[in-house]
Amino acid sequence: MPRRAGSGQLPLPRGWEEARDYDGKVFYIDHNTRRTSWIDPRDRLTKPLSFADCVGDELPWGWEAGFDPQIGAYYIDHINKTTQIEDPRKQWRGEQEKMLKDYLSVAQDALRTQKELYHVKEQRLALALDEYVRLNDAYKEKSSSHTSLFSGSSSSTKYDPDILKAEISTTQLRVKKLKRELSHMKQELLYKQQGFETLQQIDEKMSGGQSGYELNEAKAILTELKSIRKAISSGEKEKQDLMQSLAKLQERFHLDQNMGSSEPDLRSSPVNSHLSLSRQTLDAGSQTSISGDIGVRSRSNLAEKVRLSLQYEEAKRSMANLKIELSKLDGEAWPGALDIEKEKLMLINEKEELLKELQFITPQKRSQEELERLEAERQHLEEELMAARGSPSRALTERLKLEEKRKELLQKLEETTKLTTSLYSQLQSLSSSTLSMSSGSSLGSLASSRGSLNTSSRGSLNSLSSSELYYSSQGDQMDTDYQYKLDFLLQEKGGYIPSGPITTIHENEVVKSPSQPGQSGLCGVGVTASSHTTPLTEASKSVASLSSRSSLSSLSPPGSPLVLDSVFPGSSHDTSPHQFPTDFEDCELSRRFADVGLGENQALLDSDSGGASQPLLEDKGLSDCPGELLCEGATDVEKSLPKRRGLHLRGDKTTRVSAAASDESVAGDSGVYEASMKQPGEMEDVPYSEEDVTIVETAQVQIGLRYDTKSSSFMVIIAQLRNLHAFSIPHSSKVYFRVALLPSSADVSCLFRTKVHPPTESVLYNDVFRVAVSQAALQQKTLRVDLCSASKHRREECLAGTQISLADLPFSNEIFMLWYNLLPSKQMPCKKNEDGNEEPGARSQQPMLDPIDLDAVSALLARTSAELLAVEQELAQEEEEEELRPERRGPGRDCLTMLREASDEPAALRESGVPLAEGSRCTEDPKPCPRGPETSQCRKEPAEDPGQLPSGLPTLVDKETNTDEVVDSNMAVRPKDRSSLSSRQHPFVRNSVIVRSQTFSPGERSQYICRLNRSDSDSSTLAKKSLFVRNSTERRSLRVKRAVCQPTLRRTAQECPVRTSLDLELDLQASLTRQSRLNDELQALRGLRQKLEELKAQGETDLPPGVLEDERFQKLLKQAEKQAEQTKEEQKQDLNAERLMRQVSKDVCRLREQSQKEPRQVQSFREKIAYFTRAKISIPSLPADDV
């Protein structure tokens, strides 16, 4: 019956009646038409008729919101009698479709790039196979003739037996490697093509506003998703079983190899029974929740619990700080977009490799048509590379560096989560009354069920949309060789700039250059790259002191030994500063000395330059190299070269000294010229004469050597060549270096070639080659570096070379950049006459030491000293002017951050001469400031142009006497608030830091005002807020404040992300894709197990060579062995750590959303889309047949 109007309600129209369904839902009966309706007929008069008329969260007439326990919120259109899971008031679905279409264009470009990369590798493989056959034929011919072209009568060493053997083995390894890479890329291309086609189908299916899923369809999809998840779970269990069987097979191979006998059944062997018994014992121990020896040894030890509790709290703080740092990093526009840029860089590099291989093909026994075809292909490649070099990429370089930093932080975060999980399990095993793991005491609660891999029993969309499927793709790493190449491209010239020469690394044998702070880049700089890095969250351990007792009080600038009056008395006063430029132009150092500039810490003549020498700035062509490379890798002064230094002056008239204090160092080793400051007790060292023209005419090459003990890899850097005019080379020819590690090995790439360059006075190469060799084998080898020229007829002619004995190579993970003389090929001695501690370059130097002119050197040093004194006086005047008009400096940032940000303008920094104090690991000039009182001028040298002075230069203070953060002197900050300022810069750090006495702190302090306030009764400093006012809003209790904040937090926690039909379709297709790829992995594992079982049945005791040579197979077998040896407790800890890592990743996304950098739902949707085209193959296919 019609309701009576009352309480402001409109009455129902005539003939209408309100009724209730069996479940209590209200519906309306129209007796006039004898029909029922869910729509209140009065809503036509009270509700908006369209979405355009809606205000706030209103729904128009005919729409109703419902809730399903399995789906969640859904919406009913009573007019059209349809349901949908998208909110019709939101525009999110349209934004999703737009993002999907945008990503399809990006993915299509990436697919095209990788297909082209695959095609280039195919060309390289075909060329390498042909070259391998021809080299084998040439070797057979030369072996039968018993003649060697490596003699003093011939300069052509194309078919020298040693070089030919190395080239054959290198080509053979190149063929094997290209086959493995092509097999891997083929599978990866297939996955990406399938993912791209899947996204296209989703776009066609879900485009348009009326293509969403209804309620019943969504429930059917959920049911299908559950079944797929069960299949994936069973597949993962089968994968674990296959991995364990692989571990057992590998163990059997190792046992047979060590014992020399084959065991038919591993389970019957006593060794295996012992292993099984030990594992059972560990499993029994894990059932009692005792983790390791700590729980058994100190179950009731209170001190142990306190120690673990402190470590646990410290790990949580570290994890929170890492989350903050990750959230502050700017994310890329699309997940995987940076991978596309990397592949474009690698495509350029592969084309360079192909071009180089086309230039060095064997012309013998080739038809004229084939030679013309190869020449046309070579010219086409050159044109493509010239076009690629014209695009700027500084922004790309910054993005790549940012990505490297993100990877470092993610790795640290993963290690911290594992440590946190381990400490928590140990605390649990000690006592049941240990720390609580509730969300209130831990930012990443292990007890939280969010982000779990297990699906909720209700099967809600929240569980289905978790990062289970998409999380696994984030931790996949790039191929090792690709990563090595990319890191070197980043480090070359401070970032990859295609407008300059593009670096080529032969045969993918490049080494990963250090990218962490405190390590050196590979731009040919003469630095020592230490393997020890400083964590990103830690500041520099030592900065310049501002106290009066500081070493900065000296007048001598750093790196300028010529100012020492005790060594050169009166020399600085004999020469007028105005006469210096004229006299300076006459000397051989010429303008190169002036080009370096006095603002770069006077780095030309330093007695202790081994820690970070400066050969890059010696050449005019290298002075344009961006400065960020130079600031990234400078190491401490203490980490100097153990035997010799690599700093060399432009003029080639430097002294040869020994850098070590003991008699172990070899003076003049390998023809190395070194610039160093002369101490009073070292005057017996003989400098070179200014008139010795033979030194200037000697061609020299700068070579860097390093052995990485972690990866057992030997790295050779061909940095630069100078004084090429010593050889008469036609302009039509091109020069390059050929590097050979002799005697050659069949299983190691031993021959490499740099890219070719036209003959100029100085040539910059910056090529890096990597050889996987053990220390013992490396000490038995000799490095041979030949300077070769190639004419249009592809005739390889060896002009000069040098040989370096590796018997005394220090294995310290540091790069040693040294200059070597290039002896003409007719004068180069045979390697049989080498001495272990003396190299041919060193012996060739001995006759050059006879003509000595000490007066010329003294005059040069005197003029330089006078110039430095004049510059000091000018700088002192400029400093006085700067003190009268001080510039505002930014709040305290550490030295590392400031110089990294300022590296984008290397020219300005070169002129400003901003130094670092003793022990600092980063400076624009790679040579650190030496210790001692002569370093005061390091911070007193302003820029030559004050207008170019970078803003925000930090105030350097002594960390040993001051524990406060450096703040702006003009910034009104109370001393009591310094801790809070520090907490804003480093969040989640306790504010209760014990600050030592400020009595001996350097620098001026702001006025200390003492005032006692009731609102701040525990302090005696100036109040930041207004004085105490009773009953004011700010004085409300914490209980009231918590009550106000709790509803907001609760709503945020309960707020579910908006789900659309597109999200549901992506989840379904991602599950199907994951299941398909898992089946491929299982098939590959079954094939590998079958192959190993067949080899075992045939009596083989060693693993196949293809498995041993492939790093991916080695990684797979190590992972299988690790999983087989894990106990149940360790497996549980790994699962907890993975769950915690997933929760931490959600926290990072939430923090990014709070900082308004990127909405969380946008991040999640982009990850879903990128999952389909980011195929990472963890199980490689079976290796190809060997050559």
UniProtKB/Swiss-Prot annotation:
Main location: cytoplasm
Electron transport recorded as keyword: no
Pfam families to which the protein is assigned, alphabetical: WW (PF00397)
Regions crossing the membrane: none
Subunit architecture: Forms homodimers and heterodimers with WWC1 and WWC3. Interacts with DLC1 and PRKCZ. Interacts (via WW domains) with LATS1 and LATS2.
Biased composition (Acidic residues): 875-884
Subcellular localization, as worded in the UniProt entry: Cytoplasm, Cytosol
Keywords (A to Z) from UniProt: Coiled coil, Cytoplasm, Phosphoprotein, Repeat, Repressor, Transcription, Transcription regulation
InterPro entries named in the record: C2_dom, C2_domain_sf, C2_WWC, WW_dom, WW_dom_sf, WWC/KIBRA_Hippo_Reg
Sequence ranges assigned to domain C2 in this UniProt record: 697-820
Gene3D superfamilies: 2.20.70.10, C2 domain
SUPFAM superfamilies reported for this sequence: C2 domain (Calcium/lipid-binding domain, CaLB), WW domain
Region annotated Disordered, chain positions: 438-464, 830-849, 874-963
Coiled coil: 121-194, 224-256, 302-423, 859-885, 1063-1143
The gene coding this protein: Wwc2
Keyword ATP-binding included in the entry's annotation: no
Modification Phosphothreonine, positions: T999
WW domain span: 10-43, 57-90
Molecular function per GO: kinase binding; signaling adaptor activity
Function: Regulator of the Hippo signaling pathway, also known as the Salvador-Warts-Hippo (SWH) pathway. Enhances phosphorylation of LATS1 and YAP1 and negatively regulates cell proliferation and organ growth due to a suppression of the transcriptional activity of YAP1, the major effector of the Hippo pathway.
Region (Interaction with PRKCZ): 1026-1045
GO CC terms in record: cytosol
Phosphoserine modification, residue list: S286, S1017
GO biological process, one term: hippo signaling
Protein name per its UniProtKB record: Protein WWC2
Protein family according to the UniProt entry: Belongs to the WWC family.
